[in-house]
Amino acid sequence: RGLGDVYKRQFNECGLAMAGLNFVGNAAYYDIEEGKDNIAQFEFIPWILGTCANLEEAKTALIHMNLTNTPYSEQFPLAQLHWIIADQSGAITVEAMEDGMHIYENNVGVLTNNPPFNIQMFLLNQYMNLSPKQPENLFAKDIDLDQYSRGMGAIGLPGDLSSSSRFAKVAFTKLHSVSGDSENESVNQFFHILGSVDQQRGCCDVNGKYEITLYTSCCNTQKGIYYYTTYENHQITAVDLYREELDGTKLFRYPLITGEQIRWQN
């Protein structure tokens, strides 16, 4: 087995999708438990998407599941992750922690990293006054205050690169974003939404190494199309699931298209 056998973002032909995101310091997995469906952490995504057709089936499967601490190999330790599972009906967040498995309804439909999801949701209380509309003067009616700029209704929306700030910003952006009706408009708008929390090289320095957004991806779960961009290539690349043999056993691999694709006009 190679690292290519490990999946972090996936969807199936029924329209169910799942992604694992870093949850370092909070993730915990368990010893094998008799009477449970014991699933290794690295098998979690293919197990859910290989056995469940929709979110309700996934919720039922989770009742009987025990996420085990079986390592992928001696060379690769357990990845510390939490997960979002979604279909057209909604989304849930799954977090395995020292105090047990937590499953949350995810009404905002986004996930970043730490802190745990329930705390992320609590922190949104701090931003309940934010709006995409221009604000009215509630500071003092006797003081003439000027709306000197557009976008003042969202003053206070975080702009730093911490995971809790990115959670708040991408939730606000997603929940207020307006897309057109076409496939291309929806895909375009999706990349703009996630672009609001991109990490640029040099802005997050961790011991001389820089956090960057390596790639961004989305799926049309009804048509089976996977779209992605990379840090080096902003052109959207698409892979069509239904152009491959779904009932076969061969694993199809597509190398990332990197290097900026620039369209010259003269």
List PLM regions with ranges.
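A glycine-rich, hydrophobic loop/mini-helix early in the fold
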Residues: 11-33
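Short, small-residue-biased leader/transition segments that mark boundaries at the very start
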Residues: 2-7
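Short hydrophobic-aromatic micro-motifs
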Residues: 1, 15-20, 93-94
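Short, surface-exposed beta-strand-loop junctions and turns on beta-sheet-rich folds
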Residues: 24-26, 99-102, 109, 232-236
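C-terminus-biased signal that marks the final domain/tail of proteins
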Residues: 70-71, 78-79, 88, 111-266
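Aromatic- and glycine-enriched pocket-lining scaffold segments that form the walls
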Residues: 55, 59-95
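A short, structured loop/turn motif at beta-sheet edges
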Residues: 12-14, 49-57, 180-187, 221-223
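Compact, glycine/acidic-enriched structural inserts
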Residues: 25-67, 252-258
